[in-house]
Amino acid sequence: MSYQGKKNIPRITSDRLLIKGGRIVNDDQSFYADIYMEDGLIKQIGDNLIVPGGVKTIEANGKMVIPGGIDVHTHLQMPYRGMTTVDDFFQGTKAALAGGTTMIVDHVIPEPEASLTEALEKWREWADGKTCCDYSLHVDITHWSDSVKQEVETLVKQKGVNSFMVYMAYKDMYQMSNTELYEIFTFLGGLGAIAQVHAENGDIIAQEQNRMLELGITGPEGHVLSRPEELEAEAVFRAITIASQTNCPLYVTKVMSKSSVDLISQARKKGYVVFGEPITASLGTDGTHYWSKNWAKAAAFVTSPPLSPDPTTPDYINSLLASGDLQVTGSAHATFSTAQKAIGKDNFTLIPEGTNGIEERMSVIWDKSVATGKMDENQFVAVTSTNAAKIFNLYPRKGRIAVGSDSDLVIWDPDAVKIVSAKSHHSAAEYNIFEGMELRGAPLVVICQGKIMMEDGTLHATQGTGRFIPCSPFPDYVYKRIKARTKMAELHAVPRGMYDGPVHDLASTPKAGTPAGSTKGSPTKQTAPVRNLHHSGFSLIGNQADESGVRSASRRIVAPPGGRSNITSLS
């Protein structure tokens, strides 16, 4: 990059920038034009722009100019068992900027029974003093009651929060019952908020964890063995079903397996309003590392749902991201030191969960999807920025290069090649799960709020300059279809006359649990009930248990790395 302009320009003009000779890439079009920015906003786009004096000019030399990335899933400065992730809001957002991300959406995780509002204010206090890029917040619902219900309504209407995550896992901590999911989805749909879900079957996981420990499996491999992808897929299916019944939009976080991707894809094809979020880890690597002889390396990959041991999974997920079956990407960046991970050295259930990915996200997607020809540059912008802005009602302020939009821009070099290393990354973590990976595509210049935050690999981030960006309810991108369906889905009783015929006397009915006409020792064979899956909104892929005939009793096969090549059913 070359830079032109006067040195020591007055402060009043220091926020004036002109990018010349770049190729602007939005999610729907690409074209050559210059961009003039002032006071943190894009003021002009076109050729031969008339701009004030004292403007700093950046020559893009034909390189791509894209909207800054939006990472929709981070866990910075996250407390856990008296510890805190090693990347706080400053270190984490600095790493984000280094990778071309100019906005994050972090998760507020209240302690069970704690106030959601107080937790939000605590996260705001942490972030406001440290972030060096803009941020918004999701709030996780860790328990459900009338008081929580009131708080959720306040957060939506007064505090700028429009998305809430619920857990189907972490039994006896955060896990919600089906009834609670139904109530929460119904309530969020009425408020115009987005229901996010961590989808895993927590009840079965708890049983499987105990079984692994009883077998003497205490290392990181026990994590993935106790959380097979069928448990993720079952929960995804259940969440989609409940969300459909309540006419609430559903956002599935951390999509990690082929089975889950297939279910989301299938549901969307049938018209369900559901969005899927793969993360940097599931797009860039796999779960074969859980069997590493190096405990610290294996533990670095521990996250939930776990990475798939099938090494073909990342390519599969990238393909469905490119095809539009998945819409948005996050990093789920939650970094713990090796010493912190080691509290679970003798019991994998105690290993703090989380991987890095905030800095690598955009390069991983470019390398795995664009450089391989799966998606084009416009789709890249959509899945790294624009779709996130649309889903969370930030568009077109964020996620687009247009007059009036925030001047969060990245000059992207598709030909740049970098080798990922913990020695050179900007995270405070001493490991990197993408260590040694050669990635094509990287940012040359990163501009946030109209200020140059990175140029030629050098960061100029300033702590505390990030702003909280409120998210309003009822985003059109999500709720237009929901509103139309609400109008069409009004239920009415069938008008009919009063029934005046005989009514059976319940007093003469046999006691519940005693089938009429049966006697002890009766030779009559009872027909086993068969569930008709065709009655559901959509079916699971592959043969179902009802369809497979006689099966071997209680035989379980544990797949080694590379085992389950393409699990697409829950049978």
Swiss-Prot record:
Coiled coil: none annotated. Residues 516-529 have a biased composition (Polar residues). The keyword Cytoplasm applies. It is found in: Cytoplasm; Cell projection, Growth cone. Residues 502-530, 542-571 are annotated as: Disordered. One of its GO terms (molecular function) is hydrolase activity, acting on carbon-nitrogen (but not peptide) bonds, in cyclic amides. SUPFAM superfamilies: Composite domain of metallo-dependent hydrolases, Metallo-dependent hydrolases. CDD domains: D-HYD (cd01314). Expressed in the prospective neuroectoderm at the end of gastrulation. During open neural plate stages, expressed broadly throughout the anterior neural plate and in the three bilateral stripes of the posterior neural plate where primary neurons arise. At tadpole stages, expression is maintained throughout the central nervous system and in the eye retina. Necessary for signaling by class 3 semaphorins and subsequent remodeling of the cytoskeleton. Plays a role in axon guidance, neuronal growth cone collapse and cell migration. Belongs to the metallo-dependent hydrolases superfamily. Hydantoinase/dihydropyrimidinase family. Homotetramer and heterotetramer. This is Dihydropyrimidinase-related protein 3-B. The lineage of its organism: Eukaryota, Metazoa, Chordata, Craniata, Vertebrata.
